[in-house]
Regions:
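Short helix-loop capping/hinge motifs at secondary-structure junctions, enriched
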Residues: 36-37, 140-153
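Gly/Pro-rich hinge or "lid" segments in bacterial periplasmic/extracellular proteins
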Residues: 1-69, 77-78, 214, 218-219
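Structural transition elements
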Residues: 17, 143-144, 176-223, 245-252
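Sec-exported extracytoplasmic/periplasmic mature domains
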Residues: 35, 84-88, 106, 141, ...
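Extracellular/periplasmic solute-recognition and catalytic clefts
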Residues: 20-31, 56-57, 69-140, 164, ...
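Solvent-exposed, polar/charged alpha-helical surfaces in well-ordered, non-transmembrane soluble domains
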Residues: 66, 77-81, 85, 134, ...
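Ligand/substrate-recognition segments at binding pockets and active sites
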Residues: 24, 43, 61, 69-78, ...
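Extracytoplasmic/peripheral linker and loop segments enriched in polar/acidic and small residues
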Residues: 117-123, 127, 151-155, 159, ...
Length: 322
């Protein structure tokens, strides 16, 4: 640990590729593992007989390529432009490029624009088994801990942040407000219809709606921060948000987030840093509020719920729970 020899920097595995270049701030390179045991691409027609797998795709031996290069682009617009110029093989569609990339056909379905079709670009759409969240450092003296004061403060912030608006502005509507830690497509997912987050939502006229901002202000009062003033010392409540990135989209998000906190009279100070420094803050427990996410390693709710287990905490146990 003292020499920074960890699985993050020196991963060990038996997969089809070797990580031959590992510079997260610039690029990462995977090269074909000549010692790979050999597997074929799976098919729905594969069968198991006598505990042995019989594959249909006997000729589709993986890996299919010799090398994969992942480059870091710190801003979305340059990344998109390089994709259009052929420097990259695939790209997500950022909110700034959404109208340039897709349009609605007569049936209301999303399709690529004619310009991109002429370039031979294909559009792939799927519901990602991923979650993104704003988290609190539970070791922090203000937002963390099990006290009612901290709990009411966290709940008030949850009510103040308009995630529907976030999805509309920053994701062009491509997202679903989470009702639990489990995303769509995974067993146990709460769809916000029959099952929902009762801390932030309520049932009215057979519709599930977000609790209003007045209830957030009531929670602020119960936490001892009525009107954003700490009732113990008479000072304004100031909280800190840790962020990564340096592009215009990052600062647009941070400006929006400050306005969300301002709804309940909280002054939010945003601290932008690079991802390595951000990870250090998470590992050391020095950050206060942050945004992070998790992509499914395998389609099982355990892969998301295990993050909440206290023995998987980052600071005390070097786990994945931030």
């Amino acid at each position: 640990k003292n020499k920074n020899i960890t699985l993050n920097w020196y991963p060990i595995g038996t997969g089809p590729f070797k990580l031959t270049e590992n510079n997260p701030n610039l690029r990462m390179v995977l090269r074909k593992n000549s010692n790979f045991r050999g597997e074929v691409y799976p098919s729905l027609e594969d069968k198991i007989k006598n505990n042995k797998l019989y594959s249909k795709n006997t000729e589709k031996v993986i890996p299919f390529i010799d090398e994969a290069i992942f480059s870091l682009e710190k801003e979305q617009i340059p990344r998109w432009n390089k994709f259009l110029q052929g420097y990259y093989d695939n790209s997500g569609i950022a909110s700034d490029n959404y109208d340039q990339a897709v349009s609605l056909n007569s049936s209301g379905d999303i399709t690529l624009t004619d310009e991109l079709k002429e370039k031979g670009i294909h559009l792939s759409m799927a519901t990602a088994a991923s979650t993104y969240y704003i988290g609190f450092n539970m070791l922090d003296g203000i937002v963390g801990g099990k006290s009612n004061r901290a709990k009411y403060l966290r709940q008030a912030i949850t009510l103040a942040i308009d995630y529907e608006e976030y999805i509309s502005i920053f994701a062009n509507g491509r997202g679903i407000v989470a009702q639990s830690p489990i995303p769509p497509g995974i067993f146990g997912y709460q769809d916000g219809i029959k099952k929902y987050n009762k801390t932030a939502y309520e049932l009215k006229n057979k519709r599930i709606i977000k609790k209003n901002i007045e209830k957030a202000k009531i929670l602020m009062g119960k936490a001892g921060y009525a009107n954003g003033i700490d009732q113990e010392n008479g000072k304004p409540l100031i909280l800190y948000f840790e962020a990564t990135g340096s592009g215009a989209d990052t600062y647009s998000f941070l400006n929006w987030l400050r306005k969300q906190f301002k709804k309940i009279n909280i002054q939010l100070v945003t601290r932008v840093t690079d991802y390595n420094r951000f990870q250090e803050k998470m590992i050391n427990g020095t950050g206060q509020i942050f945004q992070w996410g998790w992509n499914a390693d395998y389609p099982d709710p355990e892969n998301f719920l295990f993050l909440l287990y206290s023995k998987n905490g980052k600071v005390r146990y070097s786990g994945e729970n931030a």
